[in-house]
């Protein structure tokens, strides 16, 4: 799910950036350091929307670097168990499907794929399909899945998904 939340970050700036464009440099460095990153607590930082406050810089003794505390608002993506999301299939093999939900990767075990869908290793590309070939899921297809579990690391979030519910599967 997407959230718009207030966050804080500290920017460490080299003395060569001191000058008339100091604040623009701090803003630019904030965008490059936080956008696209993942924190276990808040999820993936998609975009910085506003910068609320750039605090007074604190000079680091013996180094000359300055540390600026920055308060900002950002849009973050944090998946939860039970959430239904759309994903893109990146890999299909006999153990299941590997998908991407934006910046997050998700695995769907073959035991969480409906029993009427069988893996066909002889097709090119490999796919899961029904007996009448009415539904075929292969690489680069868009599917709708339910998140049944997440694993949160320090810098990444990984999910386990399922297609065993109503209205889940291939999005046409």
UniProtKB/Swiss-Prot annotation:
Changing residue 33 to K: Strongly reduces RNA-binding. InterPro entries: NA-bd_OB-fold, RNA_pol_Rpb7-like_N_sf, Rpb7-like, Rpb7-like_N, S1_domain. Keywords: DNA-directed RNA polymerase, Nucleus, RNA-binding, Transcription. Changing residue 94 to E: Reduces RNA-binding. GO terms for cellular component: nucleoplasm; nucleus; P-body; RNA polymerase II, core complex. Changing residue 107 to E: Reduces RNA-binding. Core component of RNA polymerase II (Pol II), a DNA-dependent RNA polymerase which synthesizes mRNA precursors and many functional non-coding RNAs using the four ribonucleoside triphosphates as substrates. Pol II is the central component of the basal RNA polymerase II transcription machinery. It is composed of mobile elements that move relative to each other. POLR2G/RPB7 is part of a subcomplex with POLR2D/RPB4 that binds to a pocket formed by POLR2A/RPB1, POLR2B/RPB2 and POLR2F/RPABC2 at the base of the clamp element. PANTHER family: DNA-DIRECTED RNA POLYMERASE II SUBUNIT RPB7, DNA-DIRECTED RNA POLYMERASE II, III. Belongs to the eukaryotic RPB7/RPC8 RNA polymerase subunit family. This is DNA-directed RNA polymerase II subunit RPB7.
């Amino acid at each position: 799910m997407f959230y718009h939340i207030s966050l804080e970050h500290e920017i460490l700036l080299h003395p060569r950036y001191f000058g008339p464009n100091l604040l623009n440099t701090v803003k630019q460095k904030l965008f490059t350091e936080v956008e696209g990153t993942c924190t276990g607590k808040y999820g993936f930082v998609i975009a910085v929307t506003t910068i609320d406050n750039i605090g007074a810089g604190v000079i680091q003794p013996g180094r000359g670097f300055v540390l600026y505390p920055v308060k900002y608002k950002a849009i973050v993506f944090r998946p939860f168990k039970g959430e239904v999301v759309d994903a893109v299939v990146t890999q299909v093999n006999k153990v299941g499907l590997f998908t991407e939900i934006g910046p997050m990767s998700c695995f769907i075990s073959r035991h969480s794929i409906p029993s009427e869908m069988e893996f066909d290793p002889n097709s090119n590309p490999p796919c899961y399909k029904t007996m009448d070939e009415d539904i075929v899921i292969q690489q680069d297809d868009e599917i709708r899945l339910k998140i049944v579990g997440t694993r949160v690391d320090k810098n990444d979030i990984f999910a386990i998904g399922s297609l065993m519910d109503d209205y889940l599967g291939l999005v046409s």
